Curated annotation (Swiss-Prot):
Lineage of the organism: Bacteria, Bacillati, Bacillota, Bacilli, Bacillales
Gene3D superfamilies xrefs: Aldehyde Dehydrogenase, Chain A, domain 1, Aldehyde Dehydrogenase, Chain A, domain 2
HAMAP family named in the record: ProA
Keyword terms, alphabetized: Amino-acid biosynthesis, Cytoplasm, NADP, Oxidoreductase, Proline biosynthesis
Annotated compartments: Cytoplasm
Organism field: Bacillus licheniformis (strain ATCC 14580 / DSM 13 / JCM 2505 / CCUG 7422 / NBRC 12200 / NCIMB 9375 / NCTC 10341 / NRRL NRS-1264 / Gibson 46)
Annotated Gene Ontology cellular component terms: cytoplasm
Name under which the protein is recorded: Gamma-glutamyl phosphate reductase 2
Length: 423
């Protein structure tokens, strides 16, 4: 280990220790204190908007010079509306029920010993993410409301934005009963800083990565700290033979074009061959109208003008753009097999008017979120009524799907007796 990496390691460990110490007081914070802290964060973000946007402009300029694509720049960019959305999101989280201290179950043993299962914070959350300044705010708000301290490690491309946001949040916390040490930010842009977080098992209770597949895979494969995996979204929509044409096209266009750069956007369209034969003109018009570039299998290329032949990488790709892979299938089984092979267990949808076909799809496909006649864009904490989310888990333990406040808690068992001993 070099002197530089030793210094980085020491700095990160110091921050993790501070977060762990702050987590002790957060466990005892009242709902009122946590809500007041969130309100203070919201106020300070609005009051310091000019400063935040000025710093964000530095990141955008640097990103463009480095040749980042439009989708990347979009995720990186802030404006007045987005900062106001951050503030509103914090206030919405404040309005949600406190997930801590809830009695999940209780019972009395035959010997009179009373048992209770109660929700408690996870402790210290390590958040590793890329060019997403919104995560800095969203993750902090959810962590504090659920009684957790947080260590933030954003991508180097958003360093000015994140530094400004955390500075403002620290100022806000200084006016509340929540310690500023509950929010730690790793300023180092050295890649070794991220790797140091992987090994902080003594101080950090869980790591949550948010970003591209390479980042998530690196964390999952190398961390000794437990990981809540937020997988990439290679989302599919299957248009069944008995799909309503207007409904199918509307849902498909929404899922692909509403926000192409997010993880719940459509990436692969699977179309039943009979439906495509009968509705190709309407589908082609919709694709052309919205500037969607198709990468298709042999049948799709034959039937959709301008379609490019799809390779193996296209079926695996999270485009995050207006590119769309299209497969023509002869049956529900073929569609489900394709999803089983290439899906990332994020969000999958079927469009059909046949309830039995829909039931078969919903029972067969393995994913965190499944839809019948609805867009995959609803896989979102806010859209599903959870409030904000810290990420969308594609694993099965300890949480799956959009992770809101309850997913940032665990439990402890409390037993109350009167001199009970085990015989």
């Amino acid at each position: 280990m070099t002197a530089t990496s030793e210094s980085i390691s020491a700095q990160i460990e110091e921050k993790a220790i501070k977060a762990k110490t702050a987590a002790k007081s957060l466990r005892l914070a009242t709902e009122k204190e946590k809500n007041e802290a969130l309100a203070a964060l919201a106020d300070h973000l609005k009051q310091n908007m000019s400063y935040i946007l000025t710093e964000n402009a530095k990141d955008i300029e640097a990103g463009r010079k480095k040749g980042y694509d439009a989708a990347y720049i979009d995720r990186l960019s802030l404006n007045e509306d987005r900062v106001l959305d951050f503030a509103d999101g914090l206030l919405e989280v404040a309005e949600l029920d406190d997930p801590v201290g809830e009695t999940l179950s209780s019972w009395t043993l035959d010997n009179g010993l009373k048992a209770e299962k109660v929700s408690v914070p996870l402790g210290v959350i390590g958040m590793i993410y890329e060019a997403r300044p919104n995560v800095t705010v969203d993750a902090t708000g959810l962590a504090l409301k659920s009684g957790n301290a947080i260590v933030l490690k954003g991508g180097s491309s958003a360093i000015h934005s994140n530094t400004a946001i955390v500075s403002v949040m620290h100022q806000a916390l200084d006016s509340t009963n929540i310690p500023r040490d509950a929010v730690q930010f790793i300023e180092s842009t050295d890649r070794s800083a991220t790797k140091q977080l992987f090994k902080m098992k003594e101080h950090i209770d869980v790591l949550i990565p948010r970003g591209g597949g390479a980042l998530i895979q690196e964390v999952v494969e190398n961390a000794t700290v437990p990981v809540l995996e937020t997988g990439v979204g290679n989302c599919h929509i299957y248009i069944d033979r008995e799909a309503d044409p207007e409904k199918a096209i509307d849902v498909m266009i929404n899922a692909k074009t509403d926000r192409p750069a997010v993880c719940n956007a459509l990436e692969t369209l699977i179309v039943h061959e009979k439906w495509l034969e009968e509705n190709s003109a309407a589908l082609i018009n919709a694709l052309n109208e919205h500037g969607i570039q198709v990468h298709g299998d042999e049948k799709a290329v034959q039937m959709i003008p301008g379609a490019r032949p799809a390779g193996e990488a296209d079926w695996q790709n999270e485009y995050l753009s207006l590119d769309l892979a299209v497969k023509v299938a002869g049956s529900l089984e073929e569609a489900c097999d394709h999803i089983e092979t290439y899906g990332t267990k994020h969000s999958e949808a079927i469009i059909t008017e046949n309830p039995e076909t829909a039931k078969a799809f919903l029972n067969t496909v393995d994913a965190a979120a499944l839809y019948h006649n609805a867009s995959t864009r609803f896989t979102d904490g806010g859209a599903l009524g959870f409030g904000a989310e810290i990420g969308i888990s594609t694993q099965k333990l300890h949480a799956r799907g959009p992770m809101g406040l309850k997913e940032l808690t665990t439990c402890k068992y409390i037993m109350r007796g009167d001199g009970h001993i085990r015989r």
